[in-house]
Each structure stands twice: as structure tokens, then as C-alpha cells.
Swiss-Prot record:
Domain of life: Eukaryota
Residue positions with a glycan: N96, N99, N296, N351, N393, N467, N530, N561, N695
The entry's keywords: Disulfide bond, Glycoprotein, Heparin-binding, Immunoglobulin domain, Membrane, Proteoglycan, Repeat, Signal, Transmembrane, Transmembrane helix
Stated name of the protein: Interference hedgehog
Membrane-spanning residues: 703-723
Subcellular location: Membrane
Primary gene name: iHog
Keyword Protease: no
GO cellular component annotations of the record: axon; cell surface; cytoneme; membrane; plasma membrane
């Protein structure tokens, strides 16, 4: 096989260029970026985290991936712009910018930023794996600030002993949230006196005269360490004497927080301020939350309700009822909102789609506040794509899928608490460009003629670039396709690969296996034909590139586009994939079976991209054939191109971009056996009103078919019976009318008499053995003739002479011995009795004992008996043996008829 390539036309180069744009490495499921996942595949293990820092500090953003990418990039959007758009920070610009430094080390990239007003904003990490870009969640860089009230305010409270005092020091705006320090008579108080909220509330439970004094506070920014002394002051007086009774009420300037925001899992304290005399007690209730007060997570305090381990169901309205027995009681209504970071509950899912088709990708997320959903296509926001549309439900609509959409599509859900992301691989099958498409009609005449000549020749349409999936530490699985085309037929494929991470460029290695194309033409409804093959003998922890070489019917070849760089990682670094379980294998046709399987859990669908099916005849020990089943949601698949009536063994394997699962258990299935009977089997057919062509076969009703077949069989039986009967009669007629060897029979038979139904039968046989009995014999003959005339019997009979057997000892060897007179007389009497019995219809067995069986059958024939023609009754002479031949000239004097 020659691998030398000839001249390529401009359409072929254009086809190659378009194929490069749409070639994909593998299905890369992008899992949640804000938490490491146990699933396999390429993902962001550690995304950059948001940071608040003072001006001039150095901040380091760290991004770590599960596999080393080809290269890292960082994108940045400034918060100073009204509509920020992310831009890539190029390495060259980073070197020239002293505020930004990028360092990459295998699978970790670090971005060092000096906090300046121009560097504040959002940052993303982008890991490139060939043409695919996996983007991290957003990290914000914010400046540490703190500010508060500047108006001095003094509060004078007079409270009866035993009450609980709650004082808010003031309102501050701080990023991050500040810490508070309280002072009593300019002496710092223990931290336990401060409640754990950002409003700076001072708690003084069960005040006494010792609690009287002056109180102040200071707020401190935890990031910058900046302290802010609040101008508010509290003068508290607790008299020792009893005060008059009073209903519960708020102190002057005291406020109630009617809305409390807290994160899920935290502990929150709902305050119920108010004093009275005697000191009131608080009673809590909630009309929205059933059992919200009295459970193992709540605690009722004199000054509030404490709820631990917040859950979304704790959101609602809480009512505090302060009562000391004096009316009116004091009520506070507090709204608790449990906030939750966004979490994607329905990630997007996409498979191979054709260029120009309409596509909808869905993504659903939960969170409080309701998260906002946006999409990235290979790191670029979908709002800048002219073919995309974002409806209110958060899905992504691609009105016409383009080649630029191929790659990693990610859905991001975002609210004030953070972000979550999930992604899928979108594969785009480009529109096939045939030779001569898009070429103008103008130009020189010679060029036009050359182009017209080129258009008449069939082109070598190359296969697509292979998708690569890891199978083991030393093998990968390649998947590619060939679009339906009118080009030259492909005979077989070859796989080529080379290592790319070594310093010296290595040559392409070619596998020994010839991968057959199969049928030379696509099926009518098959737009794309998929192929699968494995490559073994690779080295782990190295990068490879792959390509497919197609050999055509003209014995020339053409290679596909090269795959992206694929890093073959050791299996120890990858988490195992779910193993599918084969449930059933059903007969589908004589050449196909249907596989049915399931996964241990439907949640495992997010970890895989599809399945590999392996099969071979159970009686064979050869290599397994392979088939690829795209889509993690698939639970059945049709395996075709099998042999009729053959038992096959099957096993399945799930796969993702970077790994494959263990094999499922083997299971056997059989294709349908060929039909050995011509009886039509009842099948379901759709109604077709079109006229069938000459090569189409009608499917008749089984009842009608059986009726016609039975009638035809009955007619054949009747005809056969008639033919057999006629043949039998004809055979009997031939036996009676056309007797063979007539001349010989005349010599051996003696005519008895003519026979006619209208004439009396005269049977007379006289055998005179000696002259002495001749006279007596004549008298017997006359009497016999008279009896024959009276009987008028029309029956026909044949009488054969009974041969006389003589003893050899009496006759001697030469047969010349003379018989005694007594023996002759006994013979005479025997014959006379026989003759008399034959004439009167008596027993004639002695005379007819040696009659030929065939002759007797002829006599009994109705055809012969009914004949009106005169017949001859002949009696066959019995031939004597050599021992009795002397009788003719001896004692036997005459035989008369």
C-alpha cells in the first residue's frame, strides 16, 4: 500500500479545514467546580476562590485540574465597567504587567495579582484540552473597606433589675464583616458579651445595679485590620429600689430586626427585645413552620430563640410574645430567610448533532436567592453568540447549530453565596461540502475546464478526526465517523499514532489491524457511519496524538485530521466508573439482537458519556467486535450485522472522556433462526396503498393461503387417482389382448373350444390311456355334452392338464421303464372323475392345481368375460422333465380335445 499522497484540490483543502474546526477529542463531563467530585474525567479540582484584600496586598488565585491540560489561561472582567466582559490575560501582557504574574506547574496554575483599583474584578481559570475549554467558576477580587455612622448619639436607659438589655452599637458597612469590641467605662468587655451577628448587638442579661455605667463599641475590619470607633454611647441606670409595674415595651431608640438572613447549616439567634416590671418572659410560635419551636434544634432563651443547623424548611415567620401579666403584651414578627448556595440539579446533556439543526439545552438549579443561570461555549459567554437565545427558564436555545459551537458547553448558576457549574460535550457533524461547491463560474476558460474535469472525478472523502477515550493504562479506544458522500469507496482503515511529550518529534506508528469498512454503500437512512477501534501497547503518563488512514478503491489513501493531544493517565489516579448490568438480550431479527441493561443508580449518568458493546460468536475464541452507544441515558441498543441462528456472547462497558469501566458479566443471546417452512408466518404490516413494483412480494392472508393450498392438494390427489386407475385398466387390457410370444403359446396350448356368452359351453376332455377303455370314454363324453347343453352356462374357464409325475426309481434314469397296468388304470379313474366333476361344476382342484396364476387372473377379468367375440380356450401343456419325456411315445396313446 502506498502512502504517498497526490495533489489535492481546493475543495479537499477546504473540507480538511472544516473538519479540523469540528474535530473533538472526547466527551469531557464537567462536574461541580466548587467541590471535588469522586467521578472520573477532566474537571476543575480546585477553582479559584473569591478574596477580599486591602490595597497593595498580593493575592494568589490557584486553579487545579484533574489532568494536566495542554495549557492554562486566565480571563478577567473589571468591576469598573458597566457591562463587564471577560478578556484573556495573555502571558506576554502578564509579563509586562507588574500587577499580574501567571505560573503553571503541570496541573496547577497560579495567578498572582497586586490589589489595585484596576485589578479589582472577576477572574476565571480556563484549562484547554485540545479544542475544548473547561472553565472554572468565578472568583472575585474585592477591596477591604469599612465605614459607619459619624453622627454622635447618646442613649439614657433606666431599667428595672432582672431585665435583659439588648443595645445595638451602630450601623457599619464593612467588607468583610467586622468584629466588635465593647467597652464598659472604657474597659474592654469579654467577647462572650457580644452576640454573633454583624450588627454589633450588646447583650446584658439579668442586669443589676452593678451593670450601671457607660458603654461604647469599636468595629474592626478583619481583612485590613482597620478599626472604627462608633460615636454611639449608652448610659445605663439600674436602680436598686423597686420600680412601678409596667407592661413589656421597647426602650427609647431600641429597634427590632424584622428580617434575618442566615445560611443553611448555620446557627441563628432571633432576638426579642423588650423590658418591663416584673421582667417579662418570651413565648415563641410560627404560623408557617410546623414544629419550628419545640424540637431538638431549637432553644428558647430569655432574650430570643436560637435555631441550630438551619434547613430550608426553617424559612418562615416567627412570632415573639412578651408577657409579664400586665396588658398589653408585646409582639414581634420576625421573618427568617435561610439562604442556600446554588446547586445544579439537572445538568445539560448533548450528543452528536448536525450542523444547522435546532437545539435546546436545559439546565436547572436550586438556591436562595434564586440563582441566575448563564452559559459558556468553550469559555465564551453565550449572550455574545448570534445564534443563541436565553429564555426565562434558564435553558439555552441554539437556533442553528454552527461548527463554532462544538466543544464544551457549560451551565453556571450564580447568586450572592457563590456559583455552581456543570457541562457537557457538544459534537457537531459538519455539512459535507462536495467537490466543486462554492466555486464561481467566472475566470479563465482553461481554469473552468479544469475545474469541470475535476468535478467529474470522485473525491477521496476523509474520515473525521478520532475521539479518544482511555481504556486502560496501556490502551485507548478511538471513535470516528464517515459522512454519507458520493466519493470513492473506502476499503479499510489504518490507525496511526505518535508520542508528543518527548523533546524530539517522533514519527507516526501504524497498527497492524485492517479495519474493514463493511458494505460499500450507506443505508438510505444512514447519514453518518460510525467506527470503533482500540490501540494497545501505549505507555501511561505520556501524551499521544492519533489519526485515521483511509484506503480507497483506487488503492490510494487519505488521512483524517489529527486528534488533540491526549494524556494517558494511570488508572490509580482515576475513580472507577459505574459498571452497567446486562438484563436481557432479545431476538430482533435474523441478523440483529436488542440489548437491555441498567446502571446501579441513575445519578451515575453524570459520570459517563456512553457505552461500549463487545460481542462475538460463543463458539469462537477470536477477537470481540465493538460497537459504541452514545448517551449516558441509553438503556437499550440494537446490535446488527450478525449471523442468522447464531449464539453470541455480549458484555458492556461504560466510558467517559478519560476512562472506561470494568466489563459487565457475560450474557448470551441468539439471533432468529432462518425459516425452514414455506408457510407464511403471520406478521404485522402497515397499510400501503402504493402499487408494488415487479420485484415486490405480496403478503396474503394466512387463512386464504391455507384454503388455496388445500384445494390444490385435493385436486392433485383426484387427478393422481384417476391416472392410476386408467393406467391399471390399460395394463389389464394389454395383458388380455396383446399376449406376447403368440407363436410359442400356440405350440404349448391346445384349444378347448370356442367360447361365447350366447352359446352353450361344451367342456369335454377325454384322455384315453389304453384302447380297452376307449368305448367307455366315448359314452362318458356324450353324457357330458348333454349336460353342457342343459346348463347354458356362459362362464369361461381354462383347464390345465395336470402333469403326471413318475417316480424315478420306477422309470429308471433313462425313463424307458414301462408303467404297470394297475397304475394306468388308477390314473384313468382319476382323470375320469376329474372330467366328470369339471363338466358338472364340481371340484376340479386336481386338474387346475398347476394352472398358471397369471392365466387364471386373465380368466377372471370382467373385460374378458364380457366379450362377445369368439374366444379360444386353451390349455397349456405341462412340459415334462427329462425323466418323463418317454411318456409321449409310451403308454400315453392319445390326447384329444
Amino acid at each position: 500500500m502506498s502512502v504517498t499522497r497526490g495533489h489535492k484540490s481546493t475543495p479537499s483543502l477546504l473540507l480538511l479545514f472544516l473538519s479540523v474546526l469540528t474535530s473533538l477529542l472526547a466527551a469531557i463531563p464537567v462536574l461541580q467546580a466548587n467541590a471535588p467530585s469522586a467521578g472520573p474525567g477532566v474537571r476543575i479540582l480546585r477553582p479559584p476562590e473569591s478574596t477580599v484584600a486591602p490595597s497593595g496586598d498580593e493575592v494568589v488565585f490557584v486553579c487545579e485540574t484533574s489532568l494536566p491540560p495542554e495549557h492554562f489561561e486566565w480571563s478577567y472582567a473589571s468591576t469598573r465597567s458597566h457591562a463587564p466582559r471577560f478578556k484573556y490575560l495573555k502571558s506576554s501582557s502578564a509579563k509586562n504587567n507588574s500587577n499580574i504574574t501567571i505560573t503553571n506547574d503541570n496541573d496547577i496554575s497560579k495567578l498572582r495579582v497586586i490589589v489595585r483599583p484596576e485589578t479589582l474584578g472577576e477572574y476565571r481559570c480556563v484549562a484547554w484540552f485540545g479544542p475544548l475549554a473547561v472553565t472554572s467558576t468565578t472568583a472575585r477580587l474585592e477591596l477591604a473597606t469599612i465605614s459607619g455612622d459619624k453622627i454622635a448619639q447618646r442613649s439614657n436607659w433606666r431599667v428595672a433589675a432582672g431585665n435583659t438589655v439588648l443595645w445595638q452599637c451602630g450601623q457599619v458597612v464593612s467588607n468583610p464583616a467586622p468584629t466588635w469590641s465593647f467597652y464598659y467605662n472604657d474597659i474592654e468587655m469579654p467577647a462572650a458579651s457580644t452576640l454573633s451577628d454583624s450588627s454589633g448587638t450588646l447583650l446584658l442579661p439579668h442586669v443589676s445595679t452593678a451593670s450601671s455605667g457607660t458603654y461604647t463599641c469599636v468595629a474592626t475590619n478583619t481583612a485590613s485590620g482597620q478599626r472604627l470607633a462608633m460615636p454611639r454611647r449608652l448610659e445605663l441606670q439600674v436602680p436598686s429600689a423597686a420600680l412601678p409595674s409596667a407592661a413589656p415595651a421597647l426602650l427609647p431608640g431600641q429597634s427590632v430586626r424584622t428580617e434575618v438572613l442566615a445560611r443553611i447549616g448555620e446557627t441563628v439567634l432571633l432576638l426579642c427585645p423588650g423590658v418591663g416590671y416584673p421582667p417579662p418572659t418570651a413565648v415563641w410560635s410560627s404560623p408557617d413552620v410546623t414544629g419550628a419551636v419545640y424540637n431538638n434544634r431549637t432553644r428558647v432563651l430569655p432574650y430570643g430563640l436560637q435555631i441550630g443547623g438551619l434547613q430550608p424548611k426553617d424559612t418562615g415567620t416567627y412570632i415573639c410574645y412578651l408577657d409579664n401579666g400586665i396588658r398589653p403584651a408585646l409582639e414581634h414578627y420576625i421573618q427568617l430567610v435561610v439562604q442556600q448556595a446554588p446547586r445544579i440539579v439537572r445538568p445539560p446533556s448533548a450528543n452528536l448533532t448536525n450542523e444547522g439543526e435546532f437545539m435546546v439545552l436545559e439546565c436547572a438549579a436550586t438556591g436562595t436567592p434564586t440563582p441566575k443561570i448563564y452559559w459558556l461555549l468553550n469559555g465564551e459567554n453565550s449572550v455574545y453568540d448570534t445564534e443563541s437565545e436565553l429564555p426565562a427558564n434558564g435553558s439555552l436555545i441554539l437556533r442553528r447549530v454552527q461548527k463554532r459551537h462544538a466543544g464544551c458547553v457549560q451551565c453556571f448558576a450564580r447568586n450572592v453565596l457563590g456559583e455552581d457549574s456543570a457541562g457537557t460535550l457538544l459534537q457537531v457533524n459538519p455539512t459535507q461540502i462536495q467537490a466543486g461547491d462554492g466555486m464561481g463560474t467566472g475566470g479563465m476558460g482553461r481554469s473552468s475546464n479544469r475545474n469541470a474535469h475535476n468535478r467529474k472525478q470522485k473525491q477521496m472523502v476523509p474520515p473525521s478526526a478520532p475521539n479518544v477515550t482511555r481504556l486502560s493504562d496501556e490502551s485507548v479506544m478511538l471513535r470516528w465517523h464517515v459522512v454519507k458522500n458520493d466519493g470513492l469507496h473506502i476499503q479499510f482503515f489504518k490507525v496511526q499514532y505518535r508520542m508528543t511529550d518527548s523533546g524530539k518529534r517522533k514519527s507516526w506508528q501504524t497498527t497492524n489491524e485492517n479495519i474493514p469498512y463493511g458494505k460499500q454503500r450507506h443505508d438510505s437512512d444512514e447519514a453518518v457511519r460510525n467506527f470503533t477501534s482500540s490501540v494497545t501497547g501505549l505507555r501511561p503518563d505520556h501524551s499521544y496524538r492519533f489519526r485515521i488512514m483511509a484506503v480507497y478503491s483506487n488503492n490510494d489513501n487519505k488521512e483524517s485530521n489529527t486528534s488533540g493531544k491526549f494524556f494517558l493517565q494511570r488508572g490509580a489516579a482515576l475513580a472507577p466508573l459505574p459498571v452497567p448490568e446486562l438484563l436481557d438480550i432479545k431476538e430482533y431479527s435474523q441478523t440483529a439482537v436488542m440489548l437491555h441493561w441498567h446502571l446501579p443508580s441513575d445519578a451515575d449518568e453524570q459520570l459517563i458519556s456512553g457505552y461500549y458493546a463487545y460481542y462475538r460468536p460463543s463458539a469462537s475464541a477470536g477477537e470481540y467486535l465493538k460497537a459504541t452507544i452514545d448517551g449516558a441515558k441509553a438503556r437499550s441498543a440494537l446490535i446488527s450485522a450478525l449471523e442468522p441462528g447464531t449464539i453470541y456472547e455480549f458484555k458492556l462497558q461504560s466510558f467517559s472522556a478519560m476512562a472506561a469501566s470494568e466489563f459487565s458479566s457475560l450474557k448470551q443471546g441468539r439471533t432468529q433462526r432462518p425459516r425452514s417452512s414455506t408457510t407464511a408466518q403471520p406478521t404485522m404490516h402497515t397499510v400501503d396503498t402504493t402499487t408494488p413494483t415487479h420485484n415486490e412480494t405480496f403478503n396474503m392472508n394466512p387463512l386464504l393461503t391455507g384454503t388455496i393450498s388445500g384445494g390444490a392438494l385435493l385436486i392433485l390427489l383426484v387427478i393422481s387417482a384417476c391416472l392410476c386407475l386408467c393406467k391399471r385398466r390399460h395394463s389389464r387390457g394389454d395383458n388380455s389382448q396383446n399376449k406376447p410370444r403368440l407363436a410359442e403359446l400356440r405350440e404349448d396350448f391346445v384349444p378347448l373350444n370356442t367360447c361365447s356368452p350366447n352359446k352353450p359351453r361344451t367342456r369335454h376332455i377325454h384322455i384315453t390311456l389304453n384302447p380297452l377303455a376307449q368305448q367307455q370314454q366315448q359314452q362318458l363324453q356324450q353324457q357330458h355334452q348333454q349336460d353342457e347343453k342343459d346348463s347354458q352356462d356362459n362362464e369361461l374357464g381354462y383347464f390345465q392338464r395336470q402333469p403326471v409325475v413318475y417316480d424315478a426309481e420306477t422309470l429308471g434314469f433313462n425313463g424307458l421303464a414301462r408303467m404297470s397296468s394297475s397304475s394306468l388304470r388308477r390314473s384313468q379313474r382319476t382323470l375320469e372323475r376329474a372330467a366328470a366333476g369339471g363338466g358338472s361344476g364340481g371340484n376340479n382342484n386336481n386338474l387346475n392345481q398347476a394352472t398358471d396364476a397369471s392365466l387364471a387372473a386373465s380368466l377372471d377379468s370382467p373385460r374378458l368375460q364380457a366379450s362377445n367375440k369368439p374366444g379360444r380356450v386353451i390349455l397349456k401343456r405341462s412340459r415334462l422333465s427329462s425323466r418323463s419325456e418317454n411318456l409321449s411315445s409310451g403308454s400315453l396313446n392319445s390326447v384329444g380335445v
